[in-house]
Amino acid sequence: MRIDVLTLFPEMFTGPLEYSIIKRARQAGVVKVHLVNFRDWARDKHHTVDDTPFGGGPGMVLKPEPVFDAVEALRSSQEAAGPLIYLSPKGEPLTQRLVKDLAALPALTLLCGRYEGLDQRVVDHLVDREVSVGDYVLSGGEPAAIVVLDAVVRLLPGALGDDQSTEDESFNDGLLEYPQYTRPAEFRGWNVPEVLLSGHHEAIRRWRKEMSVNVTRKNRPDLLRGQDDIIAGGHS
């Protein structure tokens, strides 16, 4: 998979790209990540990428020309640049289902905003999808792009040592993940549930499903709406 990232601050990605799963996936050729500073497409000698908003108001707005020129240059240089995803608090929520859809693509382009956002003409005529990583505002789209990068890359075949690792995680079946335990079996008087030590795989499966339902009901009850079949599979 190829992922292009359009940003004014490519140095913010240096750390995340050089550690853990993303680093290993890049080294293995599972994913190629290209950082593009769209300031390089600014049209004046000062490399200006923003200007004051029409109609007044605080802050600065990213100009359309550098973004359009950078994206069009990117698209003309390769057969498939993939859809352009703009990271924005106004976008649709990033969900595991959306992450799976993105991970199935051969290519993807992430656009990081700054300041008061993008000129709306970029959103209307260039962006394929606006995506938000949560109901809060960040200083720029770079942290959100890193979230998308990590979530997508770890789903790519060969990115994890054990592809089974992603199958039992939160949201994969509409539920949050069940509790996990490891050695020692007893710690400060707190014991690991006996069923996990029993070796009875069906009993363990049922316990995990029940715990998933309970955790979801406690922390994300919205996920259970209209999921009577899932709730029936776990008993509180």
Where are these regions (language model features)?
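Gly/Ser/Thr-rich beta-alpha loop segments that engage phosphate groups in nucleotides
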Residues: 58-61, 93, 115, 119, ...
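S-adenosyl-L-methionine/SAH cofactor-binding core of RNA-modifying enzymes
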Residues: 63-114, 120
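Fold-independent oxyanion-binding glycine-rich loops
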Residues: 8, 38, 87-90, 112-115, ...
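Structured adenosyl-cofactor binding patch, chiefly the S-adenosyl-L-methionine
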Residues: 118, 122-169
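Short, solvent-exposed amphipathic alpha-helical segments in soluble enzyme
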Residues: 20-24, 100-104, 126
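Internal, active-site/partner-interface "lid" segment
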Residues: 143, 155-194
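Hydrophobic/aromatic beta-strand patches that form the interior of the parallel beta-sheet core
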Residues: 4-6, 34-36, 85, 108-109, ...
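N-terminal nucleotide/polyanion-binding subdomain common to many enzyme families
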Residues: 1-74, 197, 201-225, 235
